[in-house]
Amino acid sequence: MNRKHLPFIFALLLCLSPWVSSPTALVLGFLLASTGLVPSQLPISTYTKKLLSYSIIGLGFGIQFQQAIAVTSDGIGLIVVTIAGTLLLGFLVAKVIKLETTTAYLISAGTAICGGSAIAAVAPAIKAKDQQIALALATVFVLNSLALFIFPVIGHALALDQQTFGTWAAIAIHDTSSVVGAASAYGEQALTTATTLKLARALWIIPVALLSAILFARGNGEEGKRKLVLPYFIFWYCAAIAFSDLFPQFESVYQGIFSVAKQALVVCLFLIGCSISVEKLKSAGAKPLIFGLSLWVVISTTSLSWLLLTR
């Protein structure tokens, strides 16, 4: 490295601090890549995939399995339908607009489950490239930012009660951070409902990632045999959830691990941002954003309509 790469080192260290959010980290990496300040000799892709796996495992310690299942028993049906419906709709829309399959699937997974965390979990399972991950994350983050402001306004305009708004936010907003932000702005009960449902929704990272590995099994060797690459970190993610539930006396330790994992994920997003530039975005076109927006509008309107009809 030389002096030219000092901004990269500084930005990386900054992402280790609690002052940089995930969207900011992604933007920082993107800006450095666009200005040629990312060291070309670093195997960033390798570092990113390993750190992503470790981060997802650590996040498992922050999910209270039994509590999430118990509290969300009434809403589990809607969660399953919306997840399956979003993935299916994403497949169909991608075919119509001819969007590259892997990028479309990542955006669909992020929309269906829990935004950036779902994308981060599914990406290694389907061997997604950094550019594909970055495009999916960028799309989700843009829509997340809009949701943070739009959802409370719509909720008040329609006079939604606290539970209805909390349920809607948990289903229709991608990332947990934006769900919590929008729900807290609406009310305390909405916040409780939204947070619990969103955590239960996050549990679906496990089966979706495993299913993704099967669907995206690649051909291997000259004979063209199918090779299944199992995302073993998902099993460790599941083990982390189970362990923290079986041994609750170490809650303070789990919270520490969870906090470190969240910060590591911020670093991952910075590294992913370093893999994409203005030139690459231009070559991708507007299709990813159009695709993500289409899915988001459909899932938001249909879930809200169902909640209004059944309340």
UniProtKB/Swiss-Prot annotation:
Keyword annotations: Cell membrane, Membrane, Transmembrane, Transmembrane helix
Matches recorded under Pfam families: Cons_hypoth698 (PF03601)
UniProt subcellular location: Cell membrane
Superkingdom to which the source organism belongs: Bacteria
Membrane-topology annotation of the record: Multi-pass membrane protein
Segments traversing the membrane: 8-28, 51-71, 74-94, 106-126, 133-153, 165-185, 197-217, 228-248, 256-276, 289-309
Gene Ontology cellular-component annotations: plasma membrane
Family statement: Belongs to the UPF0324 family.
Protein name: UPF0324 membrane protein VV1_3166
Species in which this protein is naturally found: Vibrio vulnificus (strain CMCP6)
Record lineage: Bacteria, Pseudomonadati, Pseudomonadota, Gammaproteobacteria, Vibrionales
